[in-house]
Swiss-Prot record:
One BP term from GO: translation
NCBIfam families: PRK05309.1, uS11_bact
GO MF terms, alphabetically ordered: rRNA binding; structural constituent of ribosome
Cited Pfam families: Ribosomal_S11
GO CC terms, sorted: ribonucleoprotein complex; ribosome
Record function comment: Located on the platform of the 30S subunit, it bridges several disparate RNA helices of the 16S rRNA. Forms part of the Shine-Dalgarno cleft in the 70S ribosome.
Keywords: Ribonucleoprotein, Ribosomal protein, RNA-binding, rRNA-binding
Assembly and oligomerization: Part of the 30S ribosomal subunit. Interacts with proteins S7 and S18. Binds to IF-3.
Database matches in InterPro entries: Ribosomal_uS11, Ribosomal_uS11_bac-type, Ribosomal_uS11_CS, Ribosomal_uS11_sf
Organism whose genome encodes this protein: Azoarcus sp. (strain BH72)
UniProt name for this protein: Small ribosomal subunit protein uS11
Amino acid sequence: MAKTATKVRKKIKKNVAEGIAHVHASFNNTIITITDRQGNALSWATSGGAGFKGSRKSTPFAAQVAAEAAGKVAQECGVKNLEVRIKGPGPGRESAVRALNALGMKISSITDITPIPHNGCRPPKKRRI
């Protein structure tokens, strides 16, 4: 029995001028997602996906490489202006923003949206090394 040919859909190129860069910097990894104003993802990258494994994922350089990767794909979609929202205490916070700025994107605002508990859940115990 002959197989039916699957249709290959051409990816629709979005043309968005303004976007939001969500930087989630944890202690172990950094995730950068660039969305349009409505929250639809245009591009994303992680430190682990950029080729870093283990403890090197949590370095500022790994966050910089991931931000450059996400930023280049977003520039292909036409993004020129960015609003940056940073979440988390990780070491890749600053370097991810600097990498996006170095790509030539105009950053209109930087907002820290790290969730802070008002005495909610008990935090993890302190590490003993």
